UniProtKB/Swiss-Prot annotation:
InterPro entries, sorted: Ribosome_maturation_RimP, RimP_C, RimP_C_sf, RimP_N, RimP_N_sf
Name of the protein in its database record: Ribosome maturation factor RimP
Source domain of life: Bacteria
Function of the molecule: Required for maturation of 30S ribosomal subunits.
Signal peptide (UniProt feature, chain positions): none
Major site of localization recorded for this protein: cytoplasm
Length: 151
């Protein structure tokens, strides 16, 4: 059975792309009785507040018709930002050489939280240099991954 996030990606990719943007990813966070659905979009020329508002209206209309979430939730549409979350193998591969912060489902090398540089992405496996040590992490073991912004 597909996860809610993967069903939402399938449902929302075409409407977001029809507006000229890329659906970067989706996070669904349950917070008690009220949940948050975060939709991250990206574009060739970046994203502004008007872009987010337009996508929000379109996504909201699709969600009202499809009704994939049975509980009350807040819809948030935004750019991924400088510390952008990473969702797919392609996104991780695009950031080889960059530092990332990972939260894992199962520990790797005794830790569920890793920080290091992406050295390689091979299929569904991510290689990470953590303090000079090469670690391999299955992408399906990553609960959350973000770029570490450099200022």
């Amino acid at each position: 059975m597909a996860t809610l996030e993967s069903r939402l990606v399938d449902m929302l990719t075409v409407p977001v792309e029809a507006l000229g943007f890329q659906l970067w990813g989706i996070e669904y966070v349950q917070a008690g009785k009220h949940s948050i659905l975060r939709v991250f979009i990206d574009g060739e020329n970046g994203i502004n507040i008007e872009d987010c508002a337009n996508v929000s209206r379109q996504v909201s209309a699709v969600l009202d018709v499809e009704d994939p979430i049975s509980t009350e939730y807040t819809l948030e549409v935004s750019s991924p930002g400088v510390d952008r979350p990473l969702f797919t193998a392609e996104q991780y591969a695009a950031y080889v050489g960059e530092d990332v912060k990972l939260q894992l489902t199962m520990p790797v090398a005794g830790s569920r939280n890793l920080k290091g540089a992406i050295t390689q992405v091979d299929g569904q496996m991510l290689s990470l240099n953590v303090n000079g040590k090469e670690l391999v992490v299955a992408l399906d073991n990553i609960r959350k991954g973000n770029i570490i912004a450099k200022f």
